[in-house]
Amino acid sequence: MAPKRGAAVIDLSSYKLEVSDTTASRQQGLSGRDALGSFDGMLFVFGARGLYPFWMKETKFPLDIIWLDGGVVVDVATLQPPSEEKFPATHVPTHMADKVLELEAGKADELGIKNGAYVILPR
C-alpha cells in the first residue's frame, strides 16, 4: 500500500510529508532509507497525547525530531544514526505531544523551530 501523503508549512516553506498513522508505519519510520530530501519529512500521528520516545534504529542519516501538541512545538532534538556497535539511544520528550515531525538534521536550527513555534499541518 502506498504511504499517505500530506504537507506542512514551516517558516513559509512547504514540506512534503509522508504520514505515519498506523502502528506498523510508525515502527518502520525512516528506517532503512538512504536519505531524506531537503523539503521532505515524516509526520507521526498518534491517537492521543503522550510522551512518545524516538530512536534511530536502522536509520542511516541524522534527523531533527520535533514533538508537536496540536500544531505547537513542545520539544526538539537532533538525533544521530547509531554506530554499528552501539544500540541506538532513545530520546524521551520533555512534554506530551500528539504528533512528531522528522526533518533533515539542521532544519530546526535553520528555520528557528523551537518550543512554542507553530507548524501548519495537514488535516
Pin down the residues of each PLM region.
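Compact, glycine-rich, soluble single-domain proteins
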Residues: M1-R123
